[in-house]
Structure formats: C-alpha cells, structure tokens
C-alpha cells in the first residue's frame, strides 16, 4: 500500500575547485514497501533543475538505488565502498557516471524515516566531486 509522505531533502554537491552547491527541498511524495524493500518517490521541480523528472529511492537491506525517469533517465546504485557505473541520459546526450558510497545509513519504518548518503562521483572516468544527501521522510 502506498503512503503519502512529506520529504525534506538536503543535497550538497562539492566539485573540485568550486564552492559547494546546496539544495534544500520540502515536497510531497509516496512511500511503499514491496519485494523486501522501500520505494520512496517524488516529482522533481524547477528548484532542483529537474522539472518533469520522477525520482525514486529504492532502499534494500544493504544498498540504495536512485532511479530517475521522465525528462532524463538514470539509475545509480549505492553500496558502501563499492563503485558502480551508470549511464546518465539527458535530452542532449548521455554521460558515464561512476559513484561510490563512502557513507550510507538509513532507517525506514511505515511512519517514515531517513536516508543519509555520501558518495564520490566520477564523470566520464574523471574524478568530479562529492555529493551528500539527507532525506527525512514523514508519513502524512
């Protein structure tokens, strides 16, 4: 059964030689337990620069999978200490990304929970920076 939730999302992206970029967003979403894991989904907005995109965090016992569909498509797999390649599809083309979670913690219950994720990102095989996400999930 899907549960309506409120998501508080804070993302901090630090790229080599640049000031960190911080995005904070509070938005409505849905949460559902299925096939042994949690799916937490929401619609992106102009604020994130990803209008027309649906983002889903799939939380499984030892990993989190971030999937984006719509105006752009991507799937990134996060397991602590494991490097994962993914293709990031955008309207003007695709890029190869490699992500590696350096920190991954989550605690999800039917009432909500949280996800803390820190990962390094390589773009086209070149080290690009570090991304830090924190999601608070609250059932409505």
Residue ranges and their predicted role:
Residues 134-140:
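Flexible glycine-rich active-site/ligand-binding loops centered on an Asp-His dyad
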Residues 131:
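Charged phosphate-binding loop/patch that engages nucleotide di/tri-phosphates or the phosphate backbone
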Residues 1-123, 128, 140:
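N-terminal intrinsically disordered, cationic/polar leader segments
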């Amino acid at each position: 059964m899907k549960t309506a939730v409120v998501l508080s999302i804070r993302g901090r992206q630090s790229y080599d030689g640049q000031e960190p970029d911080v995005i904070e967003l509070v938005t409505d979403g849905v949460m559902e337990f299925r096939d042994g894991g949690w799916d937490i989904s929401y619609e992106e907005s102009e604020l994130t620069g990803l209008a027309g995109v649906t983002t889903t965090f799939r939380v499984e016992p030892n990993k989190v999978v971030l999937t984006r569909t719509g105006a752009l498509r991507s799937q990134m797999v996060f397991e602590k200490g494991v490097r994962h390649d993914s293709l990031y599809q955008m309207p003007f083309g695709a890029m190869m990304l490699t992500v590696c979670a350096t920190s991954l913690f989550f605690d999800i219950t039917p009432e909500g929970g949280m996800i803390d994720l820190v990962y390094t990102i390589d773009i086209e095989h070149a080290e690009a920076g570090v991304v830090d996400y924190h999601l608070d999930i609250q059932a409505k």
